[in-house]
Structure formats: structure tokens, C-alpha cells
């Protein structure tokens, strides 16, 4: 008798919880479909997708057609390269602006970073989405991580800074963990 009375509250709890879980799942699906409908209506300029009452199956069919058409389109390498170059140039300009706004930055460090960034500027006639090889690097040695650092012919300029020459080898440092 005792076993059956303990099972009933659990079954009741599951029966009450199941509709709530299903309702949340349907809400997530509907929210995602609505976002997809809006994205596709803006991207495809489709009149039928502008209607908020469009069928879910129609949204999914348009999505499949859109993805298939994107797969069949040839990749415009020149446009991709120009977009990459534009983003790269924007990052360089933002970094230079940041460096120039920091009056407390060491003059040698600022000069080395500016030199490095100028060597990364792509030539305008033959652009490929790669940066020139690093010539100087100023790592902070306040802690060590597991990512490989380019190290060779190091010249110490302060207890926490190191200048690195243009011939690099990979050196992996021990991972810093706060709980160790």
C-alpha cells in the first residue's frame, strides 16, 4: 500500500509538468519560425512571407529553397576579398586610434605596435586575405596560458615585457589556472 501512495504524487507531478514543457517547446519553435520568417522576408523581399499568418510549412519550404539557392551560387572571390580587406582595414584603424588615445603607453611599445600594424597593411594591387608575417610582438608575461606563443631571439625591455625578433618558433606555456 505504501508504494502506491508514493508513486501517485510523482505521476501527478509529471502529468502537470508535461503540458507546461510542451507549451514552452511550442513557444520556442514558434519564436524561431517567426524570426526565420522575418529574416527571409527581409532577405528575399517576398510578399507572402510578410504576412505574419503564413503557414509554418511555407516558412520551412522558403528556408530550404533559400539555402539551396545559396549553395548553388558561385562564390564571388573578389567581393569576399574586398569585404575582408575592408574589415581588416577597419580593425587596423580602430587599433591605431586606441593606441593614440593612450598617453600612458610606453613610447617604444607604441612605436613597435605601429610598425607591426603598418607591415600588415595589404598592398592595394594584389590583395590576399592574409597578414604579413609578424615582425615584432610584445606579449604580457603576467600569466602563462596554453596557447602557443611565437618566441625567438627575445630582448627583455622590462620585467613583464619582451621584444621578439622576426624568426619565430612555437613555444607552449603551462596553463594558468586560478584554482592551482
From Swiss-Prot:
Which domain of life does the protein's organism represent? Eukaryota
GO-annotated molecular function: DNA binding; protein dimerization activity
Q: Where, by tissue, is this protein expressed?
A: Expressed in the presumptive midbrain-hindbrain boundary (MHB) as early as the early gastrula stage (stage 10.5). Expression in the MHB continues through to tailbud stage. Also transiently expressed in the eye anlage at late neurula stage.
Q: Which GO terms describe its cellular component?
A: nucleus
Write down the SMART domains for this protein, in alphabetical order: HLH
Q: Could you tell me where this protein is found in the cell? A: Nucleus
Q: Could you confirm whether the keyword RNA-binding appears in this record?
A: no
Primary localization class, coarse: nucleus
Q: Which residues form the Orange domain?
A: 84-116
Disulfide-bonded cysteines: none
Q: Which Gene3D superfamilies match?
A: Helix-loop-helix DNA-binding domain (4.10.280.10)
Q: What does this protein do?
A: Transcriptional repressor. Represses transcription from both N box- and E box-containing promoters. Demarcates the prospective midbrain-hindbrain boundary (MHB) region in the neuroectoderm in early gastrulae embryos by repressing transcription of a number of target genes.
Domain remark from Swiss-Prot or TrEMBL? Has a particular type of basic domain which includes a helix-interrupting proline.
Q: What is this protein called?
A: Transcription factor HES-7.1-B
Give the species this sequence originates from. Xenopus laevis (African clawed frog)
Amino acid at each position: 500500500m505504501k508504494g502506491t501512495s508514493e508513486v501517485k504524487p510523482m505521476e501527478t507531478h509529471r502529468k502537470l509538468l508535461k503540458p507546461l514543457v510542451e507549451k514552452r517547446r511550442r513557444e520556442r519553435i514558434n519564436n524561431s519560425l517567426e524570426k526565420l520568417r522575418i529574416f527571409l522576408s527581409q532577405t528575399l523581399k517576398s510578399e507572402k512571407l510578410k504576412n505574419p499568418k503564413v503557414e509554418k510549412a511555407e516558412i520551412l519550404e522558403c528556408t530550404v529553397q533559400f539555402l539551396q539557392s545559396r549553395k548553388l551560387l558561385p562564390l564571388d572571390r573578389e567581393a569576399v576579398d574586398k569585404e575582408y580587406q575592408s574589415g581588416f582595414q577597419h580593425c587596423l584603424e580602430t587599433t591605431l586610434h586606441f593606441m593614440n588615445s593612450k598617453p600612458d603607453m610606453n613610447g617604444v611599445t607604441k612605436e613597435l605596435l605601429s610598425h607591426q600594424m603598418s607591415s600588415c597593411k595589404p598592398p592595394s594591387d594584389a590583395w590576399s586575405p592574409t597578414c604579413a608575417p609578424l615582425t615584432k610582438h610584445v606579449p604580457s608575461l603576467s600569466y602563462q596560458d596554453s596557447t602557443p606563443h611565437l618566441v625567438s631571439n627575445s630582448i627583455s625591455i622590462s620585467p613583464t615585457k619582451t621584444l621578439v625578433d622576426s624568426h619565430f618558433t612555437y613555444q607552449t606555456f603551462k596553463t594558468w589556472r586560478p584554482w592551482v
